[in-house]
């Protein structure tokens, strides 16, 4: 019977090594590829930093995606550029956006990114700012974000109701300057002789009798109504007397009108001049103009000159 291979697990079931303190500050060193050829420089660097809490990664491997970093693990990220800045341009050229996409999640809140030879220049931190880091005293710091639940209010904000002003209740001794009661009686300001004086009517308020005729009241007792009626009657009689100068009846329209006879002339004395000069009731309206004294006959509604 052939023998079968046997695998033996030699790892201990219980690891009694001291657990790593999570409160210790960890440091990540980022080195350009050229520093690997100088072993003495790496030895000097590890003499400065504690190896138990310090990790070293190459920038070219980090940029190529060959290395993964733990999340929120480092308090300080130091880019090795030599103290004299000999490798500054090389290191900054490798700090691309892909490197920051891996580096930023590995930094703790408030962790800092620094250069070995000094602070970042104004034009050297563009990719760090785009990655979400904030400039602070020549270095870049990861801001400490806080998560909080915010309730969503979709309704309209209710307006605060303004309480009405309390109504003032008038009491004894309450003074209100906005009431309609007069504080001073105007009649008390006049003496007895002032009240007895006749009222002086201004000249501009007096009616102009020459231009405007006064009208009598409906129940006039001063005699103005009788005076106005007498004036109207006199004016009417005068107008009737002027109309009686020439008044033709219906049966007189067929008679001969002779202007040579005394008393047979019109009141306007313009009957012979034409329609433009004749009265409204003139019997010669529509006839042509004729000479004064010319015989005019109106027979069967036809004028014969």
Swiss-Prot record:
Provide the protein's localization: Cytoplasm; Mitochondrion intermembrane space
| Organism expressing this protein natively | Talaromyces marneffei (strain ATCC 18224 / CBS 334.59 / QM 7333) (Penicillium marneffei)
Q: Which GO terms describe its molecular function?
A: 2 iron, 2 sulfur cluster binding; 4 iron, 4 sulfur cluster binding; electron transfer activity; metal ion binding
- Subunit architecture: Monomer. Interacts with tah18. Interacts with mia40.
Give the residue interval(s) assigned to the motif Cx2C motif 2. 279-282
4Fe-4S found in the keyword field: yes
Give the protein's recorded name.
Answer: Fe-S cluster assembly protein dre2
Q: What is known of its domains?
A: The C-terminal domain binds 2 Fe-S clusters but is otherwise mostly in an intrinsically disordered conformation.
């Amino acid at each position: 019977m052939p023998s079968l291979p046997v695998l033996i697990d030699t790892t201990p079931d219980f690891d009694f090594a001291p657990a790593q303190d999570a409160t210790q500050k960890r440091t990540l060193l980022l080195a350009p590829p050229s520093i690997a050829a100088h072993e003495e420089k790496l030895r000097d660097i590890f003499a400065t930093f504690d190896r138990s809490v310090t990790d070293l990664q190459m920038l070219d491997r980090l940029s190529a995606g060959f290395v993964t970093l733990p999340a929120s693990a480092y308090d300080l990220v130091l880019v090795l550029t030599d103290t004299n800045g000999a490798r500054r341009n090389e290191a900054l050229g490798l700090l691309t956006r892909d490197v920051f996409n891996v580096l930023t999640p590995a930094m703790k809140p408030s962790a800092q990114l620094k250069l070995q030879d000094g602070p970042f220049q104004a034009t050297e931190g563009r990719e760090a700012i785009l990655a979400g880091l904030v400039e602070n005293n020549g270095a870049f710091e990861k801001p400490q974000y806080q998560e909080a639940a915010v309730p969503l209010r979709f309704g309209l904000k209710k307006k605060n109701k303004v309480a009405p002003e309390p109504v003032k209740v008038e009491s004894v001794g309450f003074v209100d300057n906005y009431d309609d009661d007069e504080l001073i009686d105007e009649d008390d300001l006049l003496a007895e002789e002032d009240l007895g004086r006749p009222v002086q009517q201004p000249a501009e308020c007096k009616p102009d009798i020459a231009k405007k005729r006064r009208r009598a009241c409906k129940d006039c007792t001063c005699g103005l109504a009788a005076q106005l009626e007498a004036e109207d009657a006199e004016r009417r009689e005068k107008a009737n007397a002027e109309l009686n100068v020439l008044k033709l009846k219906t049966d007189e329209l067929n008679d001969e009108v002779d202007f040579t006879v005394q008393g047979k002339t019109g009141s306007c004395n313009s009957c012979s001049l034409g329609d433009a000069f004749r009265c409204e009731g003139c019997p010669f309206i529509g006839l042509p103009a004729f000479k004064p004294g010319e015989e005019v006959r109106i027979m069967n509604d036809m004028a014969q000159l």
